[in-house]
UniProtKB/Swiss-Prot annotation:
GO molecular function terms attached to this record: ABC-type heme transporter activity; ATP binding; ATP hydrolysis activity
UniProt keyword Protease present: no
The keyword ATP-binding appears for this protein: yes
Organism whose genome encodes this protein: Pseudomonas savastanoi pv. phaseolicola (strain 1448A / Race 6)
Predominant location category: membrane
Catalytic activity, EC: 7.6.2.5
SUPFAM superfamilies from the UniProt entry: P-loop containing nucleoside triphosphate hydrolases (SSF52540)
Family: Belongs to the ABC transporter superfamily. CcmA exporter (TC 3.A.1.107) family.
GO cellular component, one term: plasma membrane
Entry membrane topology: Peripheral membrane protein
Protein name as annotated: Cytochrome c biogenesis ATP-binding export protein CcmA
Function: Part of the ABC transporter complex CcmAB involved in the biogenesis of c-type cytochromes; once thought to export heme, this seems not to be the case, but its exact role is uncertain. Responsible for energy coupling to the transport system.
Subunit structure as annotated in this protein's UniProt entry: The complex is composed of two ATP-binding proteins (CcmA) and two transmembrane proteins (CcmB).
Length: 213
């Protein structure tokens, strides 16, 4: 049987920032059920790689195909094929968690109010739906951003340090949710300094040191 083509494929990917080569000739493929953890020392280009893969940056050389199309040039609505959660929570401080998520869903994947309330409940923010985000703690703001992972959405998640500012309970819950997403056929590429305790069958580590210039 011929295997299905990869959902995401990077070929000979090279990244230069501020006159410094971070990595070059990087190849990777992501298929159903995969979880890729991008590792490497600070400054090795982990966040840059994620941004290249989702089309937020252009590579110095090489190319990225997402669901068969060049990343960042999707013929359909942005965000249809992947969900990006950066290391900053990227919330509008004066809006509430409900308003922030409603706005993000309107841009990418529409969700009704019940689904958003359920997502906030899943991350332990029931009762905080209508509180301005600037009044929330750093951990609570991070959970608002991560609530997007509990809403209907794309199969591929790109996550930059998703465990930042979470307490022990929040970390354990997120680990289980990420592994469950992959076990159900989803895909994840992420950076994290956290040592994962639950690894799906499709887990593998991508050490950027192998492609350092």
């Amino acid at each position: 049987m011929i295997p299905a083509p990869p959902f995401l494929q990077a070929t000979a990917l090279t990244c230069e920032r501020d006159g410094r080569m971070l990595f070059e000739n990087l190849d990777l493929q992501v298929r159903t059920g995969d979880m890729l953890q991008v590792s490497g020392p600070n400054g090795s280009g982990k966040t840059s790689l994620l941004r290249l893969l989702c089309g937020l940056m252009q590579p110095t050389a090489g190319h990225v195909l997402l669901n068969g199309q060049p990343a960042g040039r999707q013929p359909t609505a942005p965000g249809l094929n992947l969900l990006w959660v950066g290391h900053a929570s990227a919330l509008k401080d004066l809006l509430t968690p409900l308003e922030n998520l409603s706005w993000l869903c309107a841009l990418h994947h529409p969700a009704d109010a019940d689904a958003i309330f359920n997502a906030l409940d899943a991350v332990g923010l029931a009762g905080f739906e209508d509180v301005p985000c600037h009044t929330l703690s750093a951990g609570q703001q991070r959970r608002v951003a991560l609530a997007r992972l509990y809403l209907p959405g794309p199969p591929l998640w790109l996550l930059d340090e998703p465990f930042t500012a979470l307490d022990r309970q929040g970390i354990a819950q997120l680990e289980n949710h990420l592994a469950g997403h992959c076990e159900k056929g989803g895909m994840i590429i992420m950076t994290t300094h956290h040592t994962l305790s639950r690894l799906p069958a499709g887990y593998r580590d991508i050490d950027l040191g192998q492609w350092a210039a």
